[in-house]
Every structure is written in C-alpha cells, then in structure tokens.
Amino acid sequence: MSAPHWLSQGTLVLASNNKGKITEFEKLFAELQLPVDVIPQGQLNIPDAIEDGLSFVENAIIKARHASKISGKPAIADDSGICVPVLGGAPGIYSARYAGDHGNDAANNEKLLHDLKPFRNAEQAIQGMFVCVLALVEHAEDPLPQIFQGFWHGEILEQARGEHGFGYDPLFWLSELKMSSAEMSKEEKNKISHRGQAMQRFRESLMTRE
C-alpha cells in the first residue's frame, strides 16, 4: 500500500500550544523518524481553536481542522484529559480548565481533590483514567479524519506526589508500579501513557501502509 498523502507534504502541524504536550510529542515523534517536519502551531502563529465539542474526539478534530485551515498543511491534534467515574466522568473534556482558568494545573488538581472528598474511604481507592485522542487531517475539510485513541487506568491520590510531567500527573497513582505518573521519567511515561498508547496506534497505521 502506498504511503499516505500527508507524508509527502513536508510539514505536519502539531495543533497544540500546550508546552507539556509539545514536549512529550517532540520525543514521541522523534522516535518515529517521519520524513516530515513536525511543527507546533505556535511557531506558525496559529492561536488555539475554540473547543466547543462534547467529546475528546470532536475537540481533537476541531483543533486539527483549525490548524490545517490556517496553515494550509496537514495537521494532527491531541485532545486529552482525565475521567473519574465517581464524578460522572469529570473533569473529562474540561480537564485543562476544570477550576476555571485554562492550564492552571495547581488549581485544577486542588479542585479535583476537593470534589473527591465525599467519595473517599479507607477500603476502596478512587479509580481514574487518562484519555488521549489524536486526530489527523490531510487538509482542513478532510472527510475522513484518522483517529487514534489511548487509555491509561490508575487511581487518584489524596495528595500530590512527584515533580515530573504536568496536569494531573501528580495525582495519578499506578499501583502496580508503586509510583505516580509525576514520579516517572519521560521515557518511562511515554511507553505506557495514554498519549504513548495513542501514538502507538498512529505508528501501527503507518506500518500497515508501508
């Protein structure tokens, strides 16, 4: 099967201005050694899209189309967050602005801890799941966006642990590893995280086209 058209375009726009995400993606894309330059949209002066979808998939597509329309290039976008079943799936798509201000990690973590207090008990841990959805469009009106998803299951701690990562990493406990995701190295995290898993699906899609 022939290579996808976007690989011949020379540039793939990464539709994100989130420094934490960009750092992780730069590492993940470097491992793929794609024959294109992956450029964060900020380098092209592309502002954030208005995320008015009701799901991770919708918002990922919105962001990818937005970046592709302005740049005229293929684009890939990530929409991700943490879902806590006892909160009805919240923070969900509102993870980055859960406490009000977009990207205020400390405030978001504090609100999550506060909201979980009524559900805490000594017998049972509170489950949570990181979700990542990648959407790739070859052009702004691409009728068939490619979707790649990753899910990372863990528990929500009662207090922050670790200094690495970003977002809710300090509250995300991996019982089998006896550490939070904020205590993992970038390399360790990328191997098993929701974003790493979504990128693995992306990698597999490229292999099927070789």
Curated annotation (Swiss-Prot):
What is its cofactor?
A: Mg(2+)
- Is Nucleotide-binding a UniProt keyword of this protein? yes
Q: Per the record, GO CC terms?
A: cytosol
Alphabetical list of CDD domains matching this protein: HAM1
What does the note under cofactor report?
Binds 1 Mg(2+) ion per subunit.
| Binding of substrate, residues | S16, N17, N18, K19, G20, K21, S80, F166, G167, Y168, D169, K189, H194, R195
The active site of this protein is located at D79 (proton acceptor)
Name one process (GO BP) from the record: purine nucleoside triphosphate catabolic process
Q: Which family is it part of?
A: Belongs to the HAM1 NTPase family.
Q: What is this protein called?
A: dITP/XTP pyrophosphatase
* Originating organism: Acinetobacter baylyi (strain ATCC 33305 / BD413 / ADP1)
Q: Provide the organism lineage as a comma list.
A: Bacteria, Pseudomonadati, Pseudomonadota, Gammaproteobacteria, Moraxellales
